[in-house]
């Protein structure tokens, strides 16, 4: 699933491709992608102009004229790309926005898990996906005091806690494995048992890793591409994710992989301390 750096990279690369364009028509090949009534979705967006694209957590927020916002969640495999309307339809393309300038934006999704929800601008944080999201890294809301307090109330392990989007939004499996290794915290550690100084380390590592990964245009380990069809660069900087069975770059111990709540989790059994 694209995590915050990947979704932000999609936003940055997609914006210059579609900003200022007006929708002439919309073709929906797979209606379940649309949360609204598909006919109403088409009717409301036809002749509307894309003003800009914002992002919150892993959600893209397409801002349209007449105070409309399309909340787009890419989920596991969602991708946007610009084509000409006569371009042959791909097997996994499910929605097409045809613009008045003769170009078209298509949404492709192999697993069909992605969703688009049209709402009034200003109400997007009331939608099901965004309503309960916690703060983003590198924001005032995500303070070290907030983070220490949030973890002190969590009985579950730290891996699951960091994946909980109500605690901090935008992190996924890749970056959680990385920041726990950087902070030398075992993924099965009880969140509330981690010492305050280690939580501070973890806090700074989260902010730094998200910043660097975004600068590197995200991580491509499976199918992730930006709006230009380019891969990310942070996969070349990964220390543990995808490196199970290799030596830890800190101590030389062989990295191990376990399942944590069904998620593959790679860690160093020597460097990463288990707090119970």
Curated annotation (Swiss-Prot):
Involved in base excision repair of DNA damaged by oxidation or by mutagenic agents. Acts as a DNA glycosylase that recognizes and removes damaged bases. Has a preference for oxidized purines, such as 7,8-dihydro-8-oxoguanine (8-oxoG). Has AP (apurinic/apyrimidinic) lyase activity and introduces nicks in the DNA strand. Cleaves the DNA backbone by beta-delta elimination to generate a single-strand break at the site of the removed base with both 3'- and 5'-phosphates. It catalyses: Hydrolysis of DNA containing ring-opened 7-methylguanine residues, releasing 2,6-diamino-4-hydroxy-5-(N-methyl)formamidopyrimidine; 2'-deoxyribonucleotide-(2'-deoxyribose 5'-phosphate)-2'-deoxyribonucleotide-DNA = a 3'-end 2'-deoxyribonucleotide-(2,3-dehydro-2,3-deoxyribose 5'-phosphate)-DNA + a 5'-end 5'-phospho-2'-deoxyribonucleoside-DNA + H(+). A zinc finger (FPG-type) spans 239-273. The active site is at 2 (schiff-base intermediate with dna), 3 (proton donor), 58 (proton donor), 263 (proton donor). It comes from Lactobacillus johnsonii (strain CNCM I-12250 / La1 / NCC 533). This is Formamidopyrimidine-DNA glycosylase. The keyword Lyase applies. Pfam families: Fapy_DNA_glyco, H2TH, zf-FPG_IleRS. Its cofactor is Zn(2+). Coiled coil: none annotated. PROSITE patterns: FPG_CAT, ZF_FPG_1, ZF_FPG_2. NCBIfam families: fpg, PRK01103.1. The keyword Membrane does not apply. One of its GO terms (biological process) is base-excision repair. Binds 1 zinc ion per subunit. Belongs to the FPG family. Its EC number is 3.2.2.23, 4.2.99.18. DNA binds at residues 92, 111, 154. InterPro entries: DNA_glyclase/AP_lyase_DNA-bd, DNA_glyclase_Znf_dom_DNA_BS, Formamido-pyr_DNA_Glyclase, FPG_cat, MutM-like_N-ter, Ribosomal_uS13-like_H2TH, Znf_DNA_glyclase/AP_lyase, Znf_FPG/IleRS. Keywords: DNA damage, DNA repair, DNA-binding, Glycosidase, Hydrolase, Lyase, Metal-binding, Multifunctional enzyme, Zinc, Zinc-finger.
